[in-house]
UniProtKB/Swiss-Prot annotation:
Keyword Ribonucleoprotein in record: yes
PROSITE patterns linked to this entry: RIBOSOMAL_L6_1
Alphabetical keyword list: Ribonucleoprotein, Ribosomal protein, RNA-binding, rRNA-binding
Disulfide bonds: none
Role, per record: This protein binds to the 23S rRNA, and is important in its secondary structure. It is located near the subunit interface in the base of the L7/L12 stalk, and near the tRNA binding site of the peptidyltransferase center.
KW Calcium (keyword) present: no
Matches recorded under PANTHER family: 60S/50S RIBOSOMAL PROTEIN L6/L9, LARGE RIBOSOMAL SUBUNIT PROTEIN UL6M
Protein name (database record): Large ribosomal subunit protein uL6
GO MF annotations, alphabetized: rRNA binding; structural constituent of ribosome
Database matches in HAMAP family: Ribosomal_uL6_B
Coiled-coil segments: none
SUPFAM superfamilies assigned: Ribosomal protein L6
Length: 178
């Protein structure tokens, strides 16, 4: 029994769902998201509740059931509240700037790294060492944040690099001299 798949998705005020042959469109105050789901899972919209039903209890159907429900729930949360990830930069001279929709990072390389904001993603800089990535698609926000972090992932000796706010970086001790 898929526990997540059996949970009912309750639609907040101002959110509409349309299901056209398992191509689901979710509209809300922050925008609109569309995604195609497996034809094996039946998606029923009844007023302000969405339920998902699977044809049988095979292992594959249970996994698709839970995944579909989680993706659909994330779409509903995205168009009503949105998602955001915060990154912090640690290191001497590490800073970020915004040039239009482009994020320019100085992270100890001979050249600045430039990151173009994908469609539906916005960058904010509360201060030069903090980056806030926000949007309505959880997948796009997470992927963009992971890409920015990968430009200079935190290293274990001094802890320099780009990390998620609250991320714990395990520190190592350096070599000891003779």
């Amino acid at each position: 029994m898929s526990r997540i798949g059996n949970k009912v998705i309750v639609l907040p005020a101002g959110v509409e769902i349309t299901n056209n042959d398992n191509v689901v469109t979710v509209k809300g105050p922050k925008g609109e998201l569309t995604r195609e789901f497996s034809k094996d899972i039946e998606i029923r919209v009844e007023g302000t509740e969405v339920t998902l039903h699977r044809p049988n209890d095979s292992k594959e159907m249970k996994t698709i059931h839970g995944t579909t429900r989680a993706l659909l729930n994330n779409m509903v949360i995205g168009v009503s509240e949105g998602f955001k990830k915060e990154l912090e930069m640690r290191g001497v001279g590490y800073r970020a700037q915004l040039q239009g929709k482009k994020l320019v990072l100085a992270v100890g390389k001979s050249h600045p790294d430039e990151v173009e904001a994908p469609e539906g993603i916005t960058f904010e800089l509360p201060n030069p060492t903090t980056i806030v990535i926000s949007g309505i698609s959880k997948e796009a926000v997470g992927q963009t944040a992971a890409y920015v972090r990968s430009l200079r992932a935190p290293e274990p000796y001094k802890g320099k690099g780009i990390r998620y706010v609250g991320e714990f970086v395990r520190r190592k001790e350096g070599k000891t001299g003779k």
